[in-house]
Amino acid sequence: MSTTISPALFILVFKTSIRFDIDMPHIKMVLSTISGIARWNFDRHDADNILRIESAANVSREVIAALNHNGYYCAELED
């Protein structure tokens, strides 16, 4: 799901396989390599382990590729 909340800010929502706190330092490192991400957070209490990203550009492909490359499942949730 990709929603623009202002001219320069996208909200991207992903289903992931990331379930554990121990993964967070690695996820932080992976996401820090993607330019334009302003904020991100997880809802691991949701069955889909939701990753929510606020970014200056639509970085969906980069996020999916980076997480998949590091062994995590990641798929964008569509509107």
Question: Which residue stretches match the model-derived regions?
Answer:
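Short amphipathic alpha-helix segments
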Residues: 17-35
